[in-house]
Amino acid sequence: MSKMKNPRTFEEQTECIVNSLLKDFRTPLSHAANRNLSGADEPCSGEDYSFDVAIIVGRLRILGDQFNGELEASANNIIAVTIGGQAGSTVLNDTVQSLSRTWCTQDPTLVFERAFLAVSVKLLEYVVRKAPNVARQVANYVTGMINGNTAIREFIQGQGGWENLES
């Protein structure tokens, strides 16, 4: 895969990260174990820039794995709405907000924005596995949802940007 220009804006970085998550979730486990994370497969890496999408994706996957709540029914609803051509982005946002609030209620030490990112990642992973035909559309919704949420953006930027986000 050829290298893209380095993502400079928050929006470009988010798009790059979500696209890389999508690719990562679509990669069979046998291939994922053998891939070269620092090589030419990095669509958004660069020699003169500290943005390493493979590290960020790894951290987000770890973060998503921390969510062990029930999301099957919610994810299936997102899939159905997306397939039906309805407002999937609205349903996704409402679902992520609701699941994140529930998780934070169960664990008062959890920061809402961290829960929001974890739930978003976990829902995307579920959609990729259960309905790969709508995964790209849901990934676009996730990108828009993160980019359009001021609190999430400020949380990530407050950490020093995507490259400093800890799992």
From Swiss-Prot:
Cellular-component GO terms for this entry: cytosol; nucleus
Protein name: Bcl-2-like protein 15
First and last residue of the signal peptide: none
Disulphide bonds in the chain: none
GO biological processes: regulation of apoptotic process
Species, as recorded: Mus musculus (Mouse)
Gene behind the chain: Bcl2l15
Highest taxon listed in the record's lineage: Eukaryota
InterPro entries reported for this sequence: Bcl-2-like_sf, BCL2L15
